[in-house]
């Protein structure tokens, strides 16, 4: 958001952080991941996050290990095999993941993968990128939850906007300081 604010100021337009955040939230309603990446290994993870005072949710995220593209991220009120299965079905609808190998950290995921006809195995070493992504989402949500109402729909819009930023704009040192979709020539 700071880059957007700086760019606006460069053009002589002064906008507050809250206004720019509102733009991101508004855009998130219209953003669809309309790209296809050749997928080889996908790391999947879930993490509990704090929304409002007493409300918690589970963040589910999937990222392609090699390209660093965030494939899907969403919130669920529950954790377990059924929400994991629902998440994987959504991922399968959005991307061609049938031939990809899923790296997971729990037996519940293996059952969910089998239920949606996907394959994977337990892996605790090559999943660092999805763990780091979950940590980043959690940190950003806790840092910025005061600028939005903290509800799950609001957090989901923020999650969509941040996933767009991560895939299209955020440079990654491991990708020669390019965003993931630029590095795989899809932006």
Report each predicted region and the residues it spans.
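RNase H-like two-metal-ion nuclease catalytic core shared by retroviral integrases
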Residues: 122-142, 153
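Acidic/histidine-rich, metal-coordinating catalytic segments
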Residues: 98-110
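Major-groove recognition helix of helix-turn-helix-like DNA-binding domains
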Residues: 13-28
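DNA-recognition alpha helix
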Residues: 1-13
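Short conserved beta-strand segments at catalytic cores or DNA/RNA-binding microdomains
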Residues: 55-80
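C-terminal domain-tail junction helix/linker
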Residues: 143-150, 156-187
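Two-metal-ion RNase H-like nuclease active-site motif
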Residues: 38-52, 61-63
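Active-site beta-loop-alpha junctions of metal-dependent nucleic acid enzymes
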Residues: 73-97
